[in-house]
Design a protein with these regions (language model features):
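Acidic, low-complexity, intrinsically disordered peripheral segments
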Residues: 7-8
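Gly/Ser/Thr/Pro-enriched helix-cap/hinge segments flanking short amphipathic alpha-helices
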Residues: 11-170
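Short, small-residue-biased leader/transition segments that mark boundaries at the very start
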Residues: 1-2
Length: 170
């Protein structure tokens, strides 16, 4: 097969490529692949990636689709003192603006859909709380179709909530 012999055609193309891991510093990225563990020392025919909290612990895990092979699951086992809140927005929520406050500091993100090539990531959003066990408030500004904003005060962390436009956190 051509794709398995690509190395004989090109000196720089590879069928199996190494996984890469970067740390976001806000404005630049540092290559931290060497800190990623044994999975990052091998080559894979990786062609898709999905991110999701597979065990509902608030830490995102990664599933990598390998062309013609078994998927690779990178289970996030990092333990730290930080807290989180998970939101499962129901209905047509792509584009919703989620804002929250922790200790008087405002944070925000846009709810996205989709994922990577032939992959779809977990639709739930994880809101970071740092050392605080709860959010001062959470606000969801729904996309134009719903045309509303929902706000919730003093939301406890460490769990997932479901929310539809105009409803209570469940």
């Amino acid at each position: 097969m051509l794709f398995r012999s690509i190395e004989t055609i090109s000196s720089w193309l590879r069928y199996k490529e190494p996984l890469l891991l970067f740390h976001n510093n806000g404005r630049t990225f540092d290559d931290v692949t060497t800190l990623g563990g044994p999975a990052f020392t091998l080559g894979y025919p990786a062609r898709g990636l999905a991110v999701g909290d597979l065990d509902n612990d608030g830490r995102p895990d990664v599933v990598i689709a390998n062309n013609g092979g078994a998927p690779l699951v990178l289970h996030n086992t990092l333990h730290n003192a930080n807290h989180w809140i998970g939101l499962n927005l129901l209905g047509n929520a792509v584009g919703a603006n989620i804002t929250w406050s922790v200790g008087g500091v405002k944070h925000g993100l846009f709810h996205r859909g989709g994922g990577s090539y032939l992959s779809s990531s977990d639709p739930r959003d994880i809101l970071g709380l740092g050392p605080s066990a709860s959010a001062d408030w959470i606000q969801v500004q729904w996309p134009a179709g719903a045309g509303r904003t929902d706000r919730f005060e003093h939301v406890a962390g460490g769990r997932y909530y479901s929310l539809a436009p105009g409803s209570k956190l469940k």
